[in-house]
Amino acid sequence: MYYDYRRYPYRPYSPYHRRGPCLRDFGPYPFVINIREAAKANDYFRIALWTGKHLQLTLMSINVGEDIGLEMHPNLDQFIRIEEGQGIVMMGDREDNLYFQKRVYSGSAIFIPAGTWHNLINTGHVPIKLYSIYAPPEHPHGTIHR
């Protein structure tokens, strides 16, 4: 199917520059990016890459020996995909009952139901590079945590 881009209401924009993707929040506009390349290029602890009305994508970089931090989102589901590195993910129904523990590696997909306590600890020798999808959004548009 052919689409007449001259009628498209947004200016075309490429997030890529000579040194890889430019990382900022591109939501809520239509957007396409190589997510693996963007996740690996990210050095921020957390940066919102796309924030919409019902969905948000963030990139994270977890240094060796560090973690995301024990947290729980009462009203949203979360998906995490590890693009580089390794660690241990822990989940449970209470802060003091993280009964689910699994080793995770590059390529691992983690599904976190709403109301589940969770943490991800980097046990490897390189930073964990990942992307996370929240539904609905968890962080304000444009969030950057160094």
Where are these regions (language model features)?
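A short, N-terminal "cap"/entry segment at the start of jelly-roll beta-barrel domains
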Residues: 1-56, 69, 102, 145-146
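Double-stranded beta-helix
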Residues: 37-40, 96, 121-146
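Compact, glycine-rich, soluble single-domain proteins
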Residues: 46, 90-92, 99
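Short strand-connecting beta-turns/loops that link adjacent beta-strands
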Residues: 54, 75, 125-126
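Short beta-strand His + acidic residue motifs that chelate non-heme Fe in jelly-roll/DSBH
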Residues: 68-70, 89-90, 112, 118-128
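Glycine- and acidic-residue-biased ligand/ion/polar-headgroup-sensing regions
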Residues: 75-92
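Short acidic-glycine-tyrosine-enriched beta hairpin
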Residues: 94-114
